[in-house]
Amino acid sequence: EVDACGNGSRCVAKILCDEEKKEGAIIVTSNRILKAQKISENSIRLAMGEPSFEWKTIPLSKNIDHKKINLRINDLELKDGFALNVGNPHIVFFVDDCFKYNLNKIGPLIENHEMFPEKINVTFAQIKDSTNILVNVWERGAGLTKACGTAACATGVVAFEKKLSGNDTNIHFKEGLLNIKYNSVISMTGPVSDIKEIQIKL
């Protein structure tokens, strides 16, 4: 069971909207209620709720400045990581080149660091311009990923909080992008592909 999955929730919303012939749906996760809106046949917007910046709810192992987390991973010094919870825990590092970091090597070390008692999702982000951000993501429990909805949410929030962007940003993954709007509540808009129906015998 996961706390929240942005991409998975968009897919579920697409199925519900199509099957019920409605323009919206409500999805209940273990810790949030997500409101979905069908923007078009191939686009879903999710209201992801508010981010949490409290160290106990991120959670962190101790009360430190969540906006300036410094970690030493082997010989690598990582500075000013910004930790938050957007349905699940994330840490975002803004760097000059997000793809120069070998996340297969350092991702699991950050994910399982003692600072993060419930482990953490890891994003290295790079400002492309005022409305576009590139990301390289290590997903908690999954590894290197081509896309992660909550990582996009976390990145959009952190960019705004650090005054690196406005409150409307496009988050670019290795494959595809998501639009994030942040005005106390996070809104994520992204594509959904055609759904294929399969049958599995259990």
What is each stretch, according to the model?
Residues E1-A4, S9-T145, V157-L202:
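Active-site proximal loop and beta-alpha junction motif in alpha/beta enzyme cores
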Residues A152-G156:
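Active-site-adjacent alpha-helix immediately C-terminal to a catalytic or transition-state-stabilizing loop
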